């Protein structure tokens, strides 16, 4: 079987650990029964020996497959990884969702996407990446009684994402370590208001208000200080008609939303100024993972 799992961009400014969306940029994995166990990795991580010795996809897959089927079969795994590692584009969530979906499919259990999503919560505590990876679209999600509750909205086809991918990784643990252990009431209320308003902007297609809705006081500036060029990326995007421009997940990638004509111009301007950074112009994915 073959599975495609999309990249995701989470937080979207004020929506810390609860908002995310899905991008048409996929990791592809082929999993087949085989006489012998084997792993082949192409693309991102292909030179990382650790990913072959202790592969999270493989570990999660076997854990669930053996639990569901009661068997210890050998499989051949072929990974075509396009999602950058440790760049805030949901590479870990793509692994988790992909492994679980494959395990259910190959053990003969037909599981819906909500089942896959709730299983994923055992491996990832926050739903902001796993929810759009499973469901597609723009997603607002929370956890309640060890279940994910998610509302999905398709993203307008007139919009595109400009993803700026620095040549520097940003480890999630390190990125969380710079955050304040306590927040003041004023900042908490600010983010509640802005996350709610941002969600309403997507639901009602009030995209012109996103530049106000996407402001944040809890995490973004603290993390961007780890790579100060990101402040310049954000300013350049907003000065050239971006609807919003925010840190993607915990970084180091940066997410910019714009109408298609503006998105092309923004991509070129960022690429011209930051030659060492990758800049991708991406459509939005409204399906989530796909089994082929």
Swiss-Prot record:
<keyword id="KW-0547">Nucleotide-binding</keyword>
<dbReference type="InterPro" id="IPR000870">
    <property type="entry name" value="Homoserine_kinase"/>
</dbReference>
<comment type="function">
    <text>Catalyzes the ATP-dependent phosphorylation of L-homoserine to L-homoserine phosphate.</text>
</comment>
<keyword id="KW-0067">ATP-binding</keyword>
<keyword id="KW-0791">Threonine biosynthesis</keyword>
<keyword id="KW-0808">Transferase</keyword>
<dbReference type="InterPro" id="IPR036554">
    <property type="entry name" value="GHMP_kinase_C_sf"/>
</dbReference>
<dbReference type="Pfam" id="PF00288">
    <property type="entry name" value="GHMP_kinases_N"/>
</dbReference>
<dbReference type="InterPro" id="IPR014721">
    <property type="entry name" value="Ribsml_uS5_D2-typ_fold_subgr"/>
</dbReference>
<keyword id="KW-0028">Amino-acid biosynthesis</keyword>
<dbReference type="Pfam" id="PF08544">
    <property type="entry name" value="GHMP_kinases_C"/>
</dbReference>
<dbReference type="GO" id="GO:0005524">
    <property type="term" value="F:ATP binding"/>
</dbReference>
<keyword id="KW-0418">Kinase</keyword>
<dbReference type="GO" id="GO:0009088">
    <property type="term" value="P:threonine biosynthetic process"/>
</dbReference>
<keyword id="KW-0963">Cytoplasm</keyword>
<comment type="pathway">
    <text>Amino-acid biosynthesis; L-threonine biosynthesis; L-threonine from L-aspartate: step 4/5.</text>
</comment>
<dbReference type="InterPro" id="IPR006204">
    <property type="entry name" value="GHMP_kinase_N_dom"/>
</dbReference>
<comment type="similarity">
    <text>Belongs to the GHMP kinase family. Homoserine kinase subfamily.</text>
</comment>
<dbReference type="GO" id="GO:0004413">
    <property type="term" value="F:homoserine kinase activity"/>
</dbReference>
<dbReference type="GO" id="GO:0005737">
    <property type="term" value="C:cytoplasm"/>
</dbReference>
<dbReference type="InterPro" id="IPR020568">
    <property type="entry name" value="Ribosomal_Su5_D2-typ_SF"/>
</dbReference>
<dbReference type="InterPro" id="IPR006203">
    <property type="entry name" value="GHMP_knse_ATP-bd_CS"/>
</dbReference>
<feature type="binding site">
    <location>
        <begin position="84"/>
        <end position="94"/>
    </location>
    <ligand>
        <name>ATP</name>
    </ligand>
</feature>
<protein>
    <recommendedName>
        <fullName>Homoserine kinase</fullName>
        <ecNumber>2.7.1.39</ecNumber>
    </recommendedName>
</protein>
<dbReference type="InterPro" id="IPR013750">
    <property type="entry name" value="GHMP_kinase_C_dom"/>
</dbReference>
């Amino acid at each position: 079987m073959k599975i495609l799992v999309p990249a995701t961009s989470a937080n979207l400014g004020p929506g810390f650990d609860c908002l995310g969306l899905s991008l048409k940029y996929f990791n592809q994995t082929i999993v087949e029964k085989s006489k012998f166990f084997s792993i082949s990795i192409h693309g991102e991580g292909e030179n990382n020996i650790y990913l072959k010795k202790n592969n999270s996809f493989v570990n999660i897959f076997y854990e669930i497959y053996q639990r569901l089927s009661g068997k210890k079969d050998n499989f051949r795994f072929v990974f075509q990884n396009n999602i950058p590692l440790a760049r805030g584009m949901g590479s870990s969530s793509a692994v988790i969702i992909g492994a679980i979906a494959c395990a259910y499919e190959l053990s003969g259990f037909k599981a819906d996407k909500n089942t896959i999503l709730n299983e994923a919560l055992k491996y990832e505590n926050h739903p902001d990446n796993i929810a759009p990876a499973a469901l597609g679209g723009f997603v607002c999600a929370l956890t309640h009684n060890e279940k994910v509750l998610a509302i999905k909205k398709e993203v307008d086809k007139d919009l595109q994402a400009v993803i700026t991918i620095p040549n520097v990784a940003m480890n999630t643990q390190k990125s969380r370590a710079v955050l304040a252990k306590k927040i003041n009431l004023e900042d908490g209320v600010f983010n509640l208001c802005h996350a709610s308003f941002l969600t309403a902007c997507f639901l009602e297609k009030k995209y012109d208000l996103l530049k106000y809705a996407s402001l944040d006081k809890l995490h973004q500036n603290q993390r961007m200080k780890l790579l100060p060029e990101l402040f310049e990326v954000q300013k350049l995007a907003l000065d050239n008609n971006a609807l919003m421009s925010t840190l993607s997940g915990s970084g180091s990638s940066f997410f910019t939303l714009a109408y298609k004509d503006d998105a092309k111009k923004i991509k070129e301007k960022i690429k011209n100024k930051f030659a060492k950074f990758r800049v991708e112009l991406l459509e939005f994915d409204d399906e989530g993972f796909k089994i082929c």
